[in-house]
Amino acid sequence: MFQTLRFLSRCLVTGDDKSMYYFIMNPTASSGVGRKVWKQLKPILKTRGVKYKLIAQTDKEELIAIVKKLTGRNKKLSFGGTIEVVDAASEEEIKDKDVHLVVLGGDGTLNLVFNSIVDLEHTKLSCIRIGSGNDFARNVGIEKDPEKALIKLLDNPEEIVLDYGEADYVMVDGMRKSRKYVISSGIGYDADICQEASHSKIKKVLNVFHLGKLVYVTIGIKQIFSRSNTRAKIYLDGKGPLCVRNLFFAVGMVHEMEGGGVPFCPDADPEDGKLDVCLAKGAPIPKLLTEVAMVYCRKHLLFSNVSMYRCRSIRIVVDNPQWIHTDGETPCKVRQVIMSCRQGLRLVK
């Protein structure tokens, strides 16, 4: 089925006069940049007579509930937090149509929305860049300028069916959970950076000046000096184990870049049905510092302690619990994780 979808998605998507767009935004995210961007986009929608609903929601649980109801084919709901409704189509007009969600935000908001989608087959997903990360938008070639991105979406949309990942993990207390991701999931060094950055007070200040990346660079250098590696057993597509005495980090990626444009997996193809895995073992600090710098030049694979694999799934079992991230979000520490590639993310850009 997905092969057929991929073929059809290469055709241009043409809208009709009954198309409905559900714009989703956290108005307080990225130091309030979202509100400013919306003020730029709203006149474009009004001028073109576009039917839309803006769901501006600061409460994560409320947003999750709204997305679940929308994508569960149940559009008769109360839009808590909605601040704009323009020329909304009737229930009869849209009940048999796909739901089109447009996320105004960064990778964190996109991850939250994607994990809340009930029916992927009948949900189209678009995004407009807001925030300091935006790795998903960068990976799939979405315009950096929000106004240009919206105009492209309205005038010349293209649908692509992409892969996504799913991380099934065992927490320290033995409980099992899972989360989907659109970019990457990793444990070790990159997850430690995400965890520390999520609690960084200075990040909020730097985001105001569009300098959020500096936080990740600073924390990245700090973590090289401070983190403790762990023993690990790794299984690729059920085969193994590959025993690693000092795991620095392992990341399973759908796309090339994570962490604000870091190309850990430069050959990743988001339409091949497989994850690209970058695995790094511990090394002397000077070597690690050099490797991290060389990642930006895509030269990190020249080092003997860095390996690349391609697989449908990877299972990682660690001796010491490690932080895990999915698209930069760090829910907990884990004892083991299975990262798997899935298909069926309908991106419209």
Residue ranges and their predicted role:
Residues R48, Q57, D119-F248:
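Catalytic core of DAGKc-family lipid kinases
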Residues A65, L112-V113, D135-F136, D192, ...:
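Phosphate- and divalent-cation-binding pockets in alpha/beta enzyme and binding domains
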